[in-house]
Amino acid sequence: FIHSGMKKGDTLDKLTLLCKEANVEMVYTDKIFHVLSQKENCYVIGEFHKFTSKLSTQRNHIVLVNPSNAGNMGTIMRSALGFGMNQMAIIRPAVDAFDPKVVRASMGAIFSTDFVYFDSFEEYQKVYGERELYPFMLDAKCSLHDVRPKGRFSLIFGNEATGLPAEFSKIGQSVIIPHSNRIDSLNLPIAASIAMYEATKKTILEI
């Protein structure tokens, strides 16, 4: 759907070409924007079917436990794709990955991300537990700088407000990202991005 306020130029030309190549219909209308868009500067809306994914046992995972902020989830998807970690496990209760705020914040990365919801971490662990597990916790003793994964691994992050429950300290090797005492903690997308970079920096050039 294209808004009448969309200016002609390279962006519209590129979008038109992509739609033609994919046999996707382009509809010029303003009505749908009044219903669906919460922003005044939105000029394109894409409609797609929700899809399901499967996680690979041979790839590294990022695990989000009870994420509640849609924008954060989308931002993490974007970073994860950039660092070659497009396998995401999401532990309920959690935000809907198809929330428009997630899709927007991911900048399209959601369409290249395999994500699966689980009702508990135990459910995830039963299927994918045969790997190195690294829960990120503020009271952990092991610094991220000292983490050297030797095989397939999962980076585990908690809720934006509460972090991971205490019982995660008994799972795998809990890790902390060192920072100055002038802040209480890093926000979730930044912490996850730093962790993914450190864990994949030796292989990132191969992606």
What are these regions (language model features)?
Residues 31-33, 93-95, 118, 160-162, ...:
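Short, acidic/turn-prone active-site loops that include or flank metal/cofactor-
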Residues 135-184:
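Active-site/ligand-binding-proximal alpha/beta "capping" segment
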Residues 44-46, 79-83, 95-111, 166-207:
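Structured adenosyl-cofactor binding patch, chiefly the S-adenosyl-L-methionine
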Residues 23-25, 114, 132, 173:
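Conserved beta-strand segments of alpha/beta enzyme cores
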